[in-house]
Regions:
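N-terminal export and membrane-targeting signals
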Residues: 8-27
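Extracellular/periplasmic periplasmic-binding protein-like sensory domains
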Residues: 355-430
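Extracytoplasmic ligand/sensor domains, especially the bilobed periplasmic-binding protein
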Residues: 78, 201-312, 364-392
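Solvent-exposed, acidic/polar segments of extracytosolic/periplasmic ligand-binding ectodomains
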Residues: 56-109, 113, 118, 460-560
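Short, charged, surface-exposed loops that flank catalytic or proteolytic processing sites
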Residues: 170, 440-453
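Beta-alpha junction/loop-to-helix N-cap segments that form part of ligand/metal-binding clefts
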Residues: 148-155, 163-245, 314-323, 350
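C-terminal region of N-terminal signal peptides and the immediate post-cleavage residues
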Residues: 32-55
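N-terminal extracellular/periplasmic Venus flytrap/periplasmic-binding protein-like
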Residues: 51-188, 192
């Protein structure tokens, strides 16, 4: 393996077999957040809506929220029985329950893409049962959900939101497109997208996570795509959940300049502590723009007085990265690097950290939202002598008990039993919840334009510790148009002595500790206080929701 930029006797196994579960979890970790590892390089692009259409117009015409009605009695709004008058929110035990909207009869003559007077059609993507990546995902997470069980669970979730969210008298019709190839098969993905588009839906939910041509094809046809693989310019129809690389750069810039700039090395090994910090950077190429984004972060840091003396961007190589590791470690060590900024994967970092130990070089490893490295399972793949010097930021919340999963609680509350595809629930519910929230707030005339308008008018979801906060539009990021979702991050550090159950359900030694009980921070909230490697207030996982994050207790429709 070569950087794209610089400044035993065990039977032989194929690289994919050797690393298959790990590569799959790179996908899963993004799926848990509801979006793709193939992230958009920059989500601030030209908006294809009319140039004279303002980005922030408030809610679309016909939408009356609970708070609007309380502020203006002349609206004379009526709300459905599914509204809780105590909270003004939809009456379900769901952390992301939106504000109630008033009952409005749709115009019987209105039609839109995938919309009639009494129906609205969506297409849900399903994996191919024989997809080797889907099989690896199931093996890695230890569940045996079938595609049919995933389908049944999705329909069960649609049923819940259909009953409680405002669809303005329309029944949501669900059709499915099952992948004809593996998740990384671009040819199959494009053909499947054409098939989905031919169904003429109002929206498509999900997609093959390693084939962004799926999203691009739907985008080219003007079809709304929710939690689909990321593309460079999502405006105005594609909505993701994971932060863009540009947004992650802003977090990294603010974190480094606030907490590490002009300070002595404190958390390294060997003879590095006490020296002035000298920075290097390692970035995994996640999109065609990754190298450019890495260069922009380096330039932005240097503009703030933080020199990055060595800078490497690399591609994931399932066959290993020994040659790259040797040259990279040698270059950084000879350049006097004390602190390495890492946005990488555990496969490559496994080779790099083992080489660093071999060369007796123990720098600080600062994670700037890496892929899988910020999970306990991923951390098992790197050299422990090195990783005890690791800390940084992540958009993933700590691991938690299944009962803390908002969708698990909601499904069991409504249906009276756990979801059929319990193991993969985190892979299936976010896009459904996001779509119905957009529909709930888009008003009686749902179109890609009114849905976008609703998403941009919707305020950021509540700040929490068990869940990230999501927002779309221009309220954050200095007014840049945001088509991604997650905006706040946690701070964490690696504790080599902690024992925990990892994401596979395995008992492991070595776990991440989350600063201040997993408190989350917007990009402009990072301060100069550095509490990594301080056990006071740190937690390795969430075992219960904080009192302020408890959801209301409503009678179950299933009885009991």
């Amino acid at each position: 393996m070569q950087p794209s930029s610089d400044t035993s006797n065990e039977p032989e196994r194929s690289p994919l077999r050797r690393y298959g579960p790990i590569a799959a979890i790179l996908v899963v970790i993004a799926l848990v957040a509801g979006a793709s590892v193939v992230m958009s390089g920059d989500d601030e692009g030209d908006d294809d809506l009319a140039e004279d259409t303002p980005v922030d117009q408030g809610y679309p015409e016909g939408v009356v929220t609970w708070s609007m009605a309380q502020d203006d009695e002349s609206l004379d709004a009526e709300f459905p029985d599914t509204c809780d008058p105590e909270t003004g929110k939809v009456a379900i035990p769901f952390f992301f329950a939106p504000e109630c909207t008033a009952t409005v009869e749709p115009d019987p003559d209105f039609t839109g893409p995938g919309v009639t007077a009494d129906t609205i059609k969506i297409v849900l993507w399903l994996p191919n049962e024989s997809d080797i990546i889907f099989t690896f995902i199931k093996q890695a997470l230890g569940f045996d959900d079938t595609v049919e069980e995933v389908k049944e669970t999705q329909l069960g979730l649609v049923e819940i939101f259909q009953e409680y969210y405002n669809t303005y008298g329309r029944e949501v019709e669900v059709e499915f497109v099952q992948a004809s190839g593996n998740m990384n098969d671009s040819v199959a993905a494009r053909a499947d997208a054409v098939k989905a588009a031919a169904m003429e839906p109002a929206a498509v939910l999900g997609g093959p996570l390693l084939a962004s041509v799926w999203t691009q094809e739907l985008h080219n046809q003007g079809i709304m795509c929710v939690a689909c693989p990321g593309i460079e310019d999502p405006a105005p129809t594609s909505f993701g959940l994971v932060p863009s690389e540009t947004q992650l750069n802003i977090h990294a810039l603010n974190y480094v300049t606030a907490k590490l700039q002009d300070k002595k090395v404190e958390f390294a090994g060997g003879d590095l502590n006490g020296k002035d910090r000298v920075f290097g950077q390692l970035v995994l190429a996640q999109s065609e723009n990754s190298e450019e984004n890495a260069r922009e972060l380096r330039d932005d840091l240097e503009a703030e007085g933080v020199e990055v003396v060595k800078d490497f961007t690399f591609a994931l190589n399932l066959g290993g990265a020994a040659e790259f590791a040797t040259s990279t470690v040698t270059d950084m060590k000879e350049a006097g690097v004390t602190t390495v900024l890492v946005r990488g994967d555990p496969i490559t970092l496994g080779d790099i950290t083992r080489e660093a130990t071999k060369q007796d070089w123990f720098p600080e490893w600062v994670m700037i939202t890496p892929q899988l490295l910020d999970t306990n399972a991923g951390a098992q793949l790197v050299d422990k002598e090195q990783w005890e010097h690791a800390f940084g930021i992540s958009y993933l919340p700590p691991s938690s008990e299944p009962e803390l999963n908002p969708a698990y609680k909601l499904y069991e509350w409504y249906h009276g039993e756990p979801p059929p595809a319990e193991g993969s629930l985190l892979l299936t519910y976010p896009q459904i919840a996001l779509f119905f929230t957009g529909l709930h707030l888009a008003g009686p005339e749902p179109t890609p334009e009114t849905t976008r308008q609703a998403a941009f008018a919707f305020p950021p979801t509540p700040r929490a510790r068990t869940q990230p906060s999501l927002n779309y539009g221009t309220e954050l990021w200095d007014g840049d148009v945001d088509y991604q979702g997650i905006d706040d991050l946690v701070e964490l550090w690696y504790d080599p002595e902690a024992t925990i159950t990892d994401e596979f359900g395995n008992e492991v030694t070595g776990a991440y500790q989350y600063v201040d009980g997993a408190k989350r921070f917007y990009a402009d909230e990072w301060t100069d206080e550095l509490k990594v490697f301080d056990p006071d207030g740190a937690i390795p996982k969430l075992t219960e929701a904080p009192p302020e994050e408890e959801v209301p207790d409503y009678p179950s429709p299933a009885g009991g």
